[in-house]
């Protein structure tokens, strides 16, 4: 089925490499979190939500691995240790939920003080408007926390895009290359999986979504990873959202 013939009730979008450039995430957001994590922890170390995040970080299996790398590991958990561990996780690009939550809080400050603006490709706002005008719902599924997702779209270069979005999902619903995650999303959306179109740049995510019964299309944005021939043959590929501007709801046979 070509993009021009597709119908759906929900468009589920990934962020990095799909609505937003990979370079923004890796060259702007990640460095900002690394540069500001220690100061943020010093400012809010005694806050209950930060204490919970610190406790959760200590339960991450990689925490023991990180401490083993230190020449003189501290005998107690302190700000420097946690900040260093967060920087380590960012450098390893590990999708750890408490780290993602902490990143979201750090970014919130950056967006609030105007130091950050969320990048979205220029075709994204027009597509959101077209889909909403056609009666479709738009949801987001990203490894970044829901809070971070809302910041990108709420403080984007194109203005506040949150009014277009009806639901947000992060790794609390499951990891993005697992079939169960997409089954969980369909249940939470109260929607038949085959009526959900997932847009991503990662073949493994597209495959997991299809295994759960969703439709999936892969974005080939500038800077996205190259695809193998078998991956190109397995999925529909589009360069941007423009081929999907005419996406429509399925025909209700009772009204036809």
UniProtKB/Swiss-Prot annotation:
Cofactor comment text: Binds 1 Mg(2+) ion per subunit.
Reactions catalysed according to its record: 5-methylsulfanyl-2,3-dioxopentyl phosphate + H2O = 1,2-dihydroxy-5-(methylsulfanyl)pent-1-en-3-one + phosphate
Record pathway: Amino-acid biosynthesis; L-methionine biosynthesis via salvage pathway; L-methionine from S-methyl-5-thio-alpha-D-ribose 1-phosphate: step 3/6; Amino-acid biosynthesis; L-methionine biosynthesis via salvage pathway; L-methionine from S-methyl-5-thio-alpha-D-ribose 1-phosphate: step 4/6
Keywords from the named record: Amino-acid biosynthesis, Cytoplasm, Hydrolase, Magnesium, Metal-binding, Methionine biosynthesis, Nucleus
Cofactor(s) named in the record: Mg(2+)
Binding residues for Mg(2+): 14, 16, 201
Primary localization: cytoplasm
Top-rank taxon, per record: Eukaryota
Binding site for substrate: 142-143, 176
EC number: 3.1.3.77
GO CC term, one of those recorded: cytoplasm
CDD domains: HAD_EP
Any GO BP annotation: L-methionine salvage from methylthioadenosine
InterPro entries assigned: Enolase-ppase_E1, ENOPH1_eukaryotes, HAD-like_sf, HAD-SF_hydro_IA, HAD_sf
GO MF annotations, alphabetized: acireductone synthase activity; magnesium ion binding
NCBIfam families: enolase-ppase (TIGR01691)
Oligomer and partners: Monomer.
Cited function: Bifunctional enzyme that catalyzes the enolization of 2,3-diketo-5-methylthiopentyl-1-phosphate (DK-MTP-1-P) into the intermediate 2-hydroxy-3-keto-5-methylthiopentenyl-1-phosphate (HK-MTPenyl-1-P), which is then dephosphorylated to form the acireductone 1,2-dihydroxy-3-keto-5-methylthiopentene (DHK-MTPene).
PANTHER family, sorted: ENOLASE-PHOSPHATASE E1 (PTHR20371:SF1)
Protein name (record): Enolase-phosphatase E1
Organism whose genome encodes this protein: Drosophila sechellia
Taxonomic lineage from the root: Eukaryota, Metazoa, Ecdysozoa, Arthropoda, Hexapoda
């Amino acid at each position: 089925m070509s993009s021009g013939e597709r119908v759906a009730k929900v468009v589920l979008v990934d962020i990095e490499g799909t609505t937003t450039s990979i370079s923004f995430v890796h060259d702007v957001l990640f460095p900002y979190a690394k540069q500001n994590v220690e100061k943020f922890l010093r400012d809010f170390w005694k806050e209950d939500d930060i204490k919970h995040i610190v406790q959760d970080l200590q339960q991450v299996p990689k925490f023991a691995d990180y401490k083993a790398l230190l020449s003189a590991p501290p005998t107690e958990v302190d700000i420097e240790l946690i900040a260093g561990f967060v920087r380590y996780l960012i450098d390893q690009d590990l999708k750890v939920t408490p780290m993602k939550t902490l990143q979201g809080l750090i970014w919130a400050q950056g967006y609030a003080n105007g130091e950050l603006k969320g990048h979205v490709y220029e075709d994204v706002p027009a597509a959101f408007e077209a889909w909403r005008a056609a009666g479709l719902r738009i949801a987001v599924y990203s490894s970044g926390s829901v809070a971070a997702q809302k910041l990108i779209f709420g403080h984007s270069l194109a203005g506040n895009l949150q009014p277009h979005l009806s639901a947000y999902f992060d790794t609390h619903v499951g990891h993005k290359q697992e079939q169960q995650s997409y089954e969980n999303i369909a249940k939470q959306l109260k929607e038949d999986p085959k009526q959900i179109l997932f847009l991503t740049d990662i073949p493994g995510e597209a495959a997991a979504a299809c295994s759960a019964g969703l439709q999936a299309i892969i974005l080939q944005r500038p800077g996205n990873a190259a695809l193998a021939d078998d991956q190109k043959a397995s999925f529909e590929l589009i360069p941007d959202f423009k081929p999907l501007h005419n996406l429509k709801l399925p025909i209700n046979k009772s009204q036809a």
